[in-house]
Amino acid sequence: MKQVVYTASPESQQIHAWQLNNEGALTLLQVVDAPGQVQPMVVSPDKSFLYVGVRPDFRVVAYQIDAEGKLKEAGHAPLPGSPTHISTDRQGRFIFVGSYNDACVSVTPIGENGLPGEPLQVVKGLEGCHSANIDLNNQTLFVPALKQDRIALFSLDKQGKLTPRAQAEVKTRSGAGPRHMAFHPNQRYAYSVNELDSSVDVWDISGDEVKKVQSVDALPEGFSDTRWAADIHITPDGRHLYSCDRTASNITIFSISAEGSSLKVEGYQPTETQPRGFNIDHSGQYLVAAGQKSHHIEVYKISADRGLLQPLARYAVGQGPMWVVINKLD
């Protein structure tokens, strides 16, 4: 399996491209100077483009990915607000950008050439909008509004238009602050990490109504410092889930029940200082975490049984790394 890891470092305005081998070792392929503070990133479903959000000139930049995983800037388009999170629909026709500061989510079309265009739609009133997450069926967009303790639910049509569902939202606990999400491969359950209380909620998304079925504390009992969760990801086989907390500088390891409805904490892995983002490779064997204050990334081996993390190596990147994405080239 040929994989490339991309890391975004906004303080030095750089993207680093790393080759990930089958033993979990990284080799630096390329350092790209980005046109601004690069933060959120996503790989297109066809694996041929990397879309990134940059500040302070708010725009989405498209990089073409060559056969080795190297990047070449191919085009850009304006955004209506500061990009906090970026994602695509499952068919690679639309880009969704959540903006925390501008309290909105926008829809950007992707042309047949893979390049972004002018925004098609901007949905406002999403206070603290922190991500936009399309389900595996490519039908419902889940948009956490952190400051409102809710996740807004939108239907996506073939033209890229978002319309509030009959069930327009689900609520989290007061003060939880929903942030990022992950979906179980069986398409029946979703998981959201809450920034302000470092909890993880489990949602049954299999029926017409989205229902919360569990909420789990992601920090050890007795943790008394400020809670500040950031990211969440699931292994491709749906057996293990991970979340990170920036104050604790740890990654919480969960096992997932067979049907996906229940989480159990398996352990806590100390990691790079202030882990803002991490990701899991396509084989489900490795996790790569970025330390926003350590200016390093660290690679871990995922154990097959409980999902525990074994540190392999750490690598210096740019300043203030915030985002990690992994592309499978073959």
Swiss-Prot record:
GO biological process, one term: pentose-phosphate shunt, oxidative branch
Keywords, alphabetical: Carbohydrate metabolism, Glucose metabolism, Hydrolase
Pathway participation: Carbohydrate degradation; pentose phosphate pathway; D-ribulose 5-phosphate from D-glucose 6-phosphate (oxidative stage): step 2/3
EC number: 3.1.1.31
InterPro entries for the chain: 6-phosphogluconolactonase_YbhE (IPR022528), Cycloisomerase_2 (IPR050282), Lactonase_7-beta_prop (IPR019405), N2O_reductase_N (IPR011045), WD40/YVTN_repeat-like_dom_sf (IPR015943)
GO cellular component, one term: cytosol
One Gene Ontology MF term: 6-phosphogluconolactonase activity
Catalytic activity: 6-phospho-D-glucono-1,5-lactone + H2O = 6-phospho-D-gluconate + H(+)
Top-level EC class as recorded in UniProt: hydrolase
Function: Catalyzes the hydrolysis of 6-phosphogluconolactone to 6-phosphogluconate.
NCBIfam families: PRK11028.1
Family to which the UniProt record says this protein belongs: Belongs to the cycloisomerase 2 family.
Protein name per its UniProtKB record: 6-phosphogluconolactonase
